[in-house]
């Protein structure tokens, strides 16, 4: 049973959301009194409650979504709240839909988006994975963080070929290593206020680490927002090379570490926006003519299911007219389709820029 103190906090949180008239988050939209009363006394087998799910959105009324899953079971137990939010965010993925089986497709059908290097500064494809048998950040113990870091570092240190590299634990990291990783834009910081409020940063920096290959085109974050963030990137617009490297890496890691997968939702992640393929394929791109009117840029982008962000990602501005543009859809389509959607959309934006 959920204790009285938690119930009190839940009621206060619910009232706060109700009273926040300018709050536009999905948690406010879908956490009705009926849903709230249905879920407030439930607890997962690892002890997570509705409070763990909604507290980031309660604390940060400017959240876009406002909920996180403290463990895999939360997606099922708190489905009356997660399902409509998933459907709203992953446009039209209803509670009766199932995410298709994983399919990375034929990488050879992709190419270089910008062979003349006029527009695309860099290309990046990432995915998130959770380790089977472990909860997500808020429910992890210090011992589990350490255990996961050991598993992940030994797996990654066994990679060879172009993926061969070094694992750097955040604990006890030398200042010069830290500075180098910051200069490379590889180092992740302790979570932002959204993650902090979701209790995603406990025991920091225990269990956190960064791996990168010698060429600095392949990167893995261990226990940042998700258990694993697997990232492939390089300068220029050669999406085929970037994607092929990611696919190779995911397959190699999965041989050694089983990932957490849900029959209906695909690969499970801490934040419901990343479910399904978990794939985010993005470019840093300069489109000076289109970007002169950001509203128009966003209109065109949304036609191709693309998301426009500032240069440094979410909640940032575009520096020097450089935008971060990525696929928006991650659920209800295959990995290949998600990447192809970005490929086709960016190709179209470049065409429009050239004719503007």
Swiss-Prot record:
Keyword hit for Cell membrane: no
UniProt-recorded name of the protein: Arginine kinase
Keywords for the protein's UniProt record, in alphabetical order: ATP-binding, Kinase, Nucleotide-binding, Transferase
Homology family: Belongs to the ATP:guanido phosphotransferase family.
EC number of this enzyme: 2.7.3.3
Binding site for L-arginine: 64-68, 225, 271, 314
Keyword Transmembrane in annotation: no
Alphabetical list of InterPro entries matching this protein: ATP-guanido_PTrfase, ATP-guanido_PTrfase_AS, ATP-guanido_PTrfase_cat, ATP-guanido_PTrfase_N, ATP-guanido_PTrfase_N_sf, Gln_synth/guanido_kin_cat_dom
GO molecular function terms attached to this record: arginine kinase activity; ATP binding; creatine kinase activity
GO biological process: phosphocreatine biosynthetic process
Residues reported in the UniProt entry to bind ATP: 122-126, 185, 229, 280-284, 309-314
A GO CC term assigned to this protein in UniProt: extracellular space
First-tier enzyme category under EC: transferase
Domain Phosphagen kinase C-terminal: start-end pairs: 119-356
Catalytic activity, as annotated: L-arginine + ATP = N(omega)-phospho-L-arginine + ADP + H(+)
CDD domains listed in its UniProt record: arginine_kinase_like (cd07932)
Domain Phosphagen kinase N-terminal: 9-91
Membrane spanning stretches: none
Lineage: Eukaryota, Metazoa, Ecdysozoa, Arthropoda, Crustacea
